[in-house]
């Protein structure tokens, strides 16, 4: 049985999330959370939160939590916030603040 959890509009770029996500794919839930706990990246805490949410979803569904494995962590692009930075001689530079939709799929 598959269990999903999603976090939307997270303020980190999908490219950075994917680098951390590759470290936990295919691992049991406890091992994956342990790996994420010691990673310095901002997205590691975000992914850990979504994994814990998926485990809670599994408990509600009556699935044995000890047997769950992280089947996949998907980081999709969310909407981009566009900001402006003033530059020299009246110019402006666009700053793109990217967001992510993080989906975790657990499998028994």
UniProtKB/Swiss-Prot annotation:
CDD domains: Ribosomal_L22 (cd00336)
Coiled-coil region(s): none
Keywords: Ribonucleoprotein, Ribosomal protein, RNA-binding, rRNA-binding
Keyword rRNA-binding recorded: yes
Gene Ontology molecular function terms on file: rRNA binding; structural constituent of ribosome
GO BP: translation
GO cellular component: cytosolic large ribosomal subunit
InterPro entries, alphabetized: Ribosomal_uL22 (IPR001063), Ribosomal_uL22_bac/chlpt-type (IPR005727), Ribosomal_uL22_bac/org-type (IPR047867), Ribosomal_uL22_CS (IPR018260), Ribosomal_uL22_sf (IPR036394)
SUPFAM superfamilies in the record: Ribosomal protein L22
Family to which this protein belongs: Belongs to the universal ribosomal protein uL22 family.
Description of how the protein assembles with itself and partners: Part of the 50S ribosomal subunit.
Function of the molecule: This protein binds specifically to 23S rRNA; its binding is stimulated by other ribosomal proteins, e.g. L4, L17, and L20. It is important during the early stages of 50S assembly. It makes multiple contacts with different domains of the 23S rRNA in the assembled 50S subunit and ribosome. The globular domain of the protein is located near the polypeptide exit tunnel on the outside of the subunit, while an extended beta-hairpin is found that lines the wall of the exit tunnel in the center of the 70S ribosome.
Protein's name according to its UniProt entry: Large ribosomal subunit protein uL22
Gene designation per UniProt: rplV
